[in-house]
Structure formats: C-alpha cells, structure tokens
C-alpha cells in the first residue's frame, strides 16, 4: 500500500568522469555502474540483500551482454535475488531511473531501491545492419552505435544533436565569445573544486588495469586535461559558421553515478 513515510536518499556515490578513449577505456559501463553501486550501498550502511531492485539508465547497451543493470548490480555486490531494470532515455536516463525508483517507494512496491545511470561511449561498438542476411557484393556501411543510437536525430537521418544547440544559440543570440567565456569559467570552477577536494566525498576511486600495472583514478579526467588557452581558437564543431565548439558542448564521456533511496 502507498506509504506516507518520507522518501530519503541514504547513500550516494559516483565514479570519476572519464574522457573518450581515456582512463576508463578498458571498462564496460556495467563495470563503472558496479563500482558506484558498491560504494553507495556501503555508504548507506545497509545490507545488500535489503535492496529490492536496481533501476539504471544506460542508452548505449549494444555489446555489453544481457541486462547491463543486472550485471552492474552483481558487480556492486548485490545478490541474485535483487531484480534489475535497464532503461534508456536520451540524456536523462539516470534521472528518470531515480524518479521511477522514488515512485515505486511511494507506491509501497519496494522498501529500498538503487537508482542511477552509467555509460561508456568509448566501448559503443560499430554495427553491421545487414550482417545477418549477408552482404552480396560491393561496398556497404558500418554504423557507429554511439552516433546512431545516441548522438543523431532519429527523425532526420544523420543530423547531429549538436546542430539543435546551434539552433538555440541562433534563436537566443548566444555568441561564440559568450559561450567560450562560459566554458572557460565552468572548467575553472571544476578545476578549483577538484583542487579543494570538494568532489572527493561523492567520488569513489576506480582501479584500472593497464600494461604498466594497476592505476587508481580518483578525479575527473576532463577538467584535469583541459587547455584553456586553446578554447578561443577551436573550430566550430557542428557547422562551418557555427558558434559551438568542442569546449562548449557536452563532452563524450564514461562514468556512473548512483544513489540508494529508501
């Protein structure tokens, strides 16, 4: 039955944010999801078998194996008895998972839920659409799962999501200079927050195996590697005379964030 008890967040964690083909290239999305789940459940101080269900957003599912959210749950130390649902919603999948988890708790369907999101754009595979039927003769296409199912419009084939940002910039008259200034300030704030340790409490470090041994990643990769003096000279990313550059757009990244609510 529906509960009148307040719904509260009892634990939260995220991995560092990795760059495209960067520190987390060897890890699948469910590896990152598992790391975030494990940390958040530990921080909540609850028994893993008390979690009723995992709801995790993940839009680029191809190539990961069956049920990525369930794999993340196992890697996060949750038992086989804990159910899991992987859901897809462009950009807002993790937030949608959290909303739906809240609603299940309000409805009284569950007592404890795990919710969050995970993505690894680096590991999104290339697709052979005609592979099952066979290629008869001549050249054909392979499709980028990241672009086709994540970053391109489904209704105007091949149109990048970034071009809609250009439409907004034109409509609201955001100049290149304004966007560059905003990007620079944003990176500076992220760098300052990292240096001061402001993000440390929310991040769970992730250990990555490399050819040189194990490396522990504990800070966000993008801000640490950003070159602010290069921003003003970057070429437009989506149209020849556009105002949006690689510095202004949302980065292509790999990470997972997760909360436990009850």
Language-model features and meaning:
Residues 13-16, 57-62, 89-93, 117-124, ...:
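Acidic, glycine-rich active-site loops and adjacent beta-strand->loop/helix elements
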Residues 254-262:
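Single conserved hydrophobic/aromatic residue that forms the stacking wall/gate
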Residues 27, 58-112, 155-163, 225-249:
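Conserved catalytic cysteine-centered active-site region
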Residues 49-57, 83-88, 113-117, 180-185, ...:
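Beta-strand segments within the central parallel beta-sheet cores of soluble alpha/beta enzyme folds
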Residues 112-168:
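Flexible glycine-/small-residue-enriched beta->alpha junction loops
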Residues 89-119, 169-198, 253:
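Active-site-proximal alpha-helical scaffold in enzymes
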Residues 8, 13-15, 26-34, 178-253:
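N-terminal extracellular/periplasmic Venus flytrap/periplasmic-binding protein-like
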Residues 2-59, 63-64, 68-76, 83, ...:
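Conserved active-site "lid/cap" helical segment
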């Amino acid at each position: 039955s529906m509960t009148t008890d307040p719904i509260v967040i009892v634990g939260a964690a995220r991995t560092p944010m990795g760059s495209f083909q960067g520190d987390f290239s060897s890890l699948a999305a469910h590896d990152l999801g598992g790391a975030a789940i494990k940390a958040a459940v530990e921080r909540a101080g609850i028994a893993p078998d008390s979690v009723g269900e995992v709801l995790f957003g993940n839009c680029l599912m191809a190539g990961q194996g069956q049920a990525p959210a369930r794999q993340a749950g196992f890697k996060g130390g949750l038992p086989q008895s804990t159910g899991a649902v992987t859901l897809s919603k462009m950009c807002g999948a993790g937030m949608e998972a959290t909303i739906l988890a809240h609603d299940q708790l309000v409805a009284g369907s569950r007592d404890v839920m795990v919710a969050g999101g995970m993505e690894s754009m680096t590991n999104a595979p290339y697709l052979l659409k005609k592979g099952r039927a066979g290629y008869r003769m001549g050249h054909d296409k392979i499709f980028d799962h990241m672009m086709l199912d994540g970053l391109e419009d489904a209704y105007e084939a091949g149109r990048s999501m970034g071009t809609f940002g250009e439409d907004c910039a034109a409509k609201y008259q955001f100049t290149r200079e304004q966007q560059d200034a905003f990007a620079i300030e944003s990176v500076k704030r992220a760098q300052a927050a990292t240096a001061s340790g402001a993000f440390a409490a929310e991040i769970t470090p992730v250990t990555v195996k490399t050819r040189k041994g194990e490396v522990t990643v504990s800070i966000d990769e993008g801000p640490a590697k950003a070159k602010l003096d290069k921003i003003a000279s970057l070429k437009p990313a989506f149209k020849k005379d556009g105002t949006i550059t690689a510095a202004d757009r949302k980065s292509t990244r790999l990470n997972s964030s997760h909360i436990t609510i009850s």
